[in-house]
Swiss-Prot record:
CDD domains per record: FERM_B-lobe (cd14473), FERM_C_FRMPD1_FRMPD3_FRMPD4 (cd13183), FERM_F1_FRMPD1 (cd17168), LGNbd_FRMPD1 (cd21942), PDZ_FRMPD1_3_4-like (cd06769)
Gene: FRMPD1
Compositional bias annotation for Low complexity: 730-742
Quaternary context: Interacts with GPSM1. Interacts with GPSM2 (via TPR repeat region).
Start and end residues of each PDZ domain: 57-135
Superkingdom of origin organism: Eukaryota
Ranges of Polar residues composition bias in the record: 720-729, 793-811, 968-986, 1139-1150
Name under which the protein is recorded: FERM and PDZ domain-containing protein 1
Upper classification of the organism: Eukaryota, Metazoa, Chordata, Craniata, Vertebrata
Amino acid sequence: MEELETSLFQTRKAHRIEQMVARWLRRSRDSSARAKVAAADGPARNPTQTLIPVRHTVKIDKDTLLQDYGFHISESLPLTVVAVTAGGSAHGKLFPGDQILQMNNEPAEDLSWERAVDILREAEDSLSITVVRCTSGVPKSSFLTEEKRARLKTNPVKVHFAEEVLISGHSQGNSLLCMPNVLKLYLENGQTKAFKFEANTTVKDIILTVKEKLSIRSIEYFALALEEQYSISRLHLLHEEELIQQVVEREESHDYRCLFRVCFVPKDPLDLLKEDPVAFEYLYLQSCSDVLQERFAVEMKCSSALRLAALHIQERIYACAQPQKISLKYIEKDWGIENFISPTLLRNMKGKDIKKAISFHMKRNQNLLEPRQKQLISAAQLRLNYLQILGELKTYGGRIFNATLMLQDRESYIALLVGAKYGISQVINSKLNIMSTLAEFANISRVELTEESEKVSVVKVYLQDVKVLTLLLESNSAKDLACLIAGYYRLLVDPVTSIFLWPGNKQQAHRVSAEEGYESRACSDSEESSEVDCVLEPLSDRRLVKLAPCRSLIKEEQPPGNSPTPEVARRGPSTCGASSTTDSAESEASDSANTESRGYRTSGSSESMDALEEDDLDTCSSSRSTFFHFGSPGLAESIDSDSQEERSGIETSGFLCLLDLAQRANPQCQKTEFSESAALETFGWAPELSTVRLDPRLYEGSHADYYSLCSSVSPASYLSDSSESTASRQGGAPPAWGQQGWTEAQPSSMLEPLALHPPLAFEDGSSDEEYYDAADKLTPPGPPSGPRDVSTAEPSATSLQNKASTSSPENSLPCGPDGRQPSRRGGVKKYAKTLRKRRSFLQTDYTSQVSFPLVPSASLESVDDVCYYDREPYLALGAPSPTVSSLQDMQGEPGLLETKALGLLAPLRETKSTNPASRVMEMEPETMETKSVIDSRVSSISAIRFRIDPNNKENSGVVPAASSSASTPHCSNPGSSGPDTAQARPSQILPLSQDLDGIAPKEPTIEHGDSSFSLSSGDPNPDRACLASNPGLNNVSQGDTLELQLEPHVQLEMGLESFCTNHIQETAPKYTEPLLSPRDEPRSDECGINPGEKIASIPTKEEPQGQLSLERDREVTNKNGTNVFQEESRKDSGDSPGDVSNNVSQTLDISSPAGKIVTSLSLDAPVTGTEQIPPHPPRDPQGQSREPPGQGCQAQEQKLFVELDLDPDFFLGKQTVSPAVPPEGIKAEAPNHVTGQDIAPRDSPEWVCFNPEPSLPEPLPCPQEDPHLETSNHCLLSEGKSDSSSICLSAEKSFLCFAPESHPEVSASLRVATSLGFAGMNEMVAPRIGMDQCSCQFSYATCFRGPQPETEEEDRDLEAHPMAPLTSPPSAGSPVVLPWRPARAHSCTTAPLSRKSHIWPEYCSRALRQLKATPASTPEGFIQLMESLLELQDILETSWGVGNKHPPEKCTWHFTESRSRLCMGSQKLLSSCRHVIRMDQSPEEMQGAVRDTFQHLVQLAGLCFQFTDCSRCSARHREAAGNLRDVVYTYHQFIEAAKSTCERGYHDLSVKLLARQCTALTAAVFCLTQKFRASTAL
């Protein structure tokens, strides 16, 4: 019976199914028949596509947050709505495709797109818009039509959806998912999609297909990730080039789910909302899901989770158009509270508490609106606020990796945080949110992933200065880190450049880019493929020619392990000719540093050759601006056939000689590299060249475009239009390089004004990698390059220009009419904004401008081309002596100072200083050994001075300060080349300033009032050179003393351009040339002037200020053996105090021509006079007491310290100072503020010009307090292309000549410590992706450990969070030695003074003078200190900086300088603070230590005050201003604690409080400097 019922039931069921199928078939036939009849009746009739136009008029309110109406209109007519912002004002009112009829009662048919945009902008609060909406009577067909099928044939889809969509992971039983080659992809919106993939389907193909389906525009934020089944917090990224087949075939693949996620979180979600509302909504849904799944549970606080839940609930209410006052009971019953609150929170909190908290937060969220805003908060605002709250979590906006940092001699276990906000940062203190930036994405050139073992991999992050971050991680984490860095690089720097190449598939055929073939197909099931796709698609399979310098280097062999690229290169006729041999190698050789594949390592640094190679390629390829070729099959053979010839001549090739030069300059490096590279033929590039890595931009095999860094060929925007397809590529014949550089004028469209700086490759053979471990006091393994090496290397530099390109003219085609490089489509990767930025920071809106010096010379006198301002100040010492080895790295490598002694220095006087060199003092004040450094160094502040007096008594032994060749036509006195004018050795001169922008040299003119006269080399009366025409200026001394004071170590410690690590006056100046060369009979008041520049100086009589003399460390002998500088401290005799003058120190920039030198000198030109003298006295020595020759080096160091608010410690060790001893003799002050924007002839030998950058448009008045000086305190301003500011001196004040109340405004541009714009290259980097301000709120106790023995603390601090970055990108910025040095130097006119400029020096002078005059008793000292501190706080509250600007392209240089100075200054401040908390000292000693701390604080503030701004760094400087105020406030508390300790004695409580305040100050200083942490801090 039961069987009968069962059988009957099955029969009925089958019958019902048959009936249903029959009914469906019958309906299908009927509909098809009706369709045929309709088609026969009229072809236009189609019942399935009936369009019903409906007219709608809607009123849209402007979104107060986004300031827009939430929709976008088409640029073409008729005006239609193309997009509606999700959650915006127009959401639900307008729809894509609506045709606009009226906007604010204006008919749209008469409107252009521009006018429509204007109407939208002019509409204040609301917009009335009438649209026509075409609605279809029936749903769109999802079946493929013939039309769609035809489109798909021309535009094939690479990824196919499976036949069903899974909801929440549940399948309806379709067996398709059990078939092979199907990937289930889980979306964050709850959907699951199934993809059928092929053997060559990649991750990128899947992503692009999902992009179509979801209509996402900003796909660069997305990636595929594998989520572990049992640990949802572990997500592993997939590289876009990975094959899906390989991913699915992994053994552990069954334990993972594949997710489509926003893996690269934007810095500001508002940017994403404006850019792509769909992607923003996806990110919001993903974030909500992550919160509910507790991905951020480690960081998330309960209050934050509840607030997010309230926002989520409100967003749902608004999005679902629910009534505003909906009860939580309804939400809990209808929606479920578990959909908004994480399970852990539900378990741990009572339901009543949860409801109460959510109600509170929902009310609070209403306050997001402005008080007078009437409209309700929108869903978009709630979503935005939700994401902004989440953005405060480090694990949301970044990802933490535990890695082992591989240093040279040790390993360091660190926690890395990688994210858009943080770059690559090291987490120092997670609780206090203290991080140190190791690298920014914009500074990364390449990422490599190497498998060390089955479970461990190595990630190498190559930075622009050829520094490598080597990180050891677990294999999955290593891959995630590499993919994350590459993804953020694409997102933030260059969307078309992949810096992480997937090693698996190098021979892939051309792949469609993210935009190619998919851009317009936004509708579901690919049913709306655009016609543009059909047009573009045939080109996608067509190989596009790469634009690149195609030169045959060495015909290399394919190394094992690298898949060859000749097949790729030869696939078609468009390939660049030698791509299979040359181009790929060139791209790889130049790619920063591939030392592992190259097979050799330098002895002390793995990256020294890499620095040279990559810069050589940068320089060569960028210099040959028109060297592009259209590749053809014949070209490959022709170039290959020439390769043997090339091999023989490769040593002299212009393309390679830079590397040769650098290798010769470092013989040890050369020996190691060539011995380790067995495959090298003639040159050390073969292994590198044979390393073929397939750059994603180089799928077509034309790898040479890796380095088509055409010099200013075209804006990068010309390269970035991915929709423009140009199948042909145009090139130009290479310019010939003549003996003296480029002899042909380049087309203006092809070249910017030539960059006058030496090639970057001329760098120290020892890389910065040697300096990883400053705290460990490593010494560089090899001796620095000596002058002999440089001289041998120089012919190669000459041969570089002699050797023309080997490419024959027939292989090149003319360039485009405007010199523009044709853009490339997405498949052939284009360059876009960044043209492979490296250490030279070549990211500009234009392509790089790296060119060779215009005046190369094979003589030793021009060897200074090889000097590199930052790392190589000693490379070109002019004598075959050992050099001062490691004073060059300006970021502070203290241990490096102990390496080499100076060989040929003049006999050194035993120094009484027991302090280490300033670099040692900066970095490790009490832990460094100092003897070898001090004994072998030159004086920290050494003056070169020569007297110019009528009797020529003191000129015989004087060494002029810098070089100015007598043969140079623009020298002041061309004929003066007497025995006393020793030539300045090129070794002391550093590379050329970038500021030399071709301004024609002029004769310097001095103008005053109505009278003016010019200073030329042929001036019959050179005595007038330093005199004004005003007859009242009569205080000129007859024995004018011009002192050029070099402070190289000060410059170094300040992080400046290491002006002259070896001073100009050091050693016997065998090669010096006269800079300010007097005639054979020098005139009394002549200032040596370079006529190419402008000089204006007025001697002034000074009040007695107790000029201080100080001891010299050594003597300097000239080439004849005479004692030029007696370095003894002498007491002055015979001069009344009234004859004593104060000094004004002034920074002069000595620039040399075309790739020569720039040296910054500090010019101390003291001026006094005892008698009234006619304005232009010919020669009248009467009344002037000249110094004896032994006094010639009477230095002004103590005055410099006093006037610049620096104690001798801030310089290179303490100098003994006689505070009350005035200098003997009267010095005529000739402070020459000179400008020289142009250079002497291009072919001239070395010469120097003064080149300060900031300048005064007009003179300024100098109020006087001494009646004798009323008419003598004016100086003249010489007007020129670069307005130079002149300096005059005042009476009375040691630093200022006016009181603030008399002149509240001081010219902002009158800073003698000028900004050089000292550049070795043009550079512009992407805006620094910095970290947020330190989130320490109040207590800094846990930031650092308390006081410990100082040696341990110094070492620990330097290792854990070094105050000074261990390396830096090339810097140029403002080489200002000290803040506001010329506070008492003013120009003289009636222009109002700007308080902003001189308020700081005035304060410094007064505060420090008052402190020095304060009695030693504790109460008075602290009271005075408190007053000064309060004044400092007032200054910081009311003003900030001088307001000077620097060009954006030099922002990186200035940032490097700011960072270096801040790190050095903060280190000194913290070091002095540690002296205060010592237990074993008397109150008087403590107060002395406190005074030192205040002095260092003033110095630190001064460093911050002198920042210059641009659009890129102004925000960072504003933040630094706030942090500086925090430092001063914390310091105030520190001083109060110190005062309390002094008054109450050293009780435990007071000492603990003092130590705690010291710790707080340390953290505050750290917060100040953390924003300036170098992107290459390791």
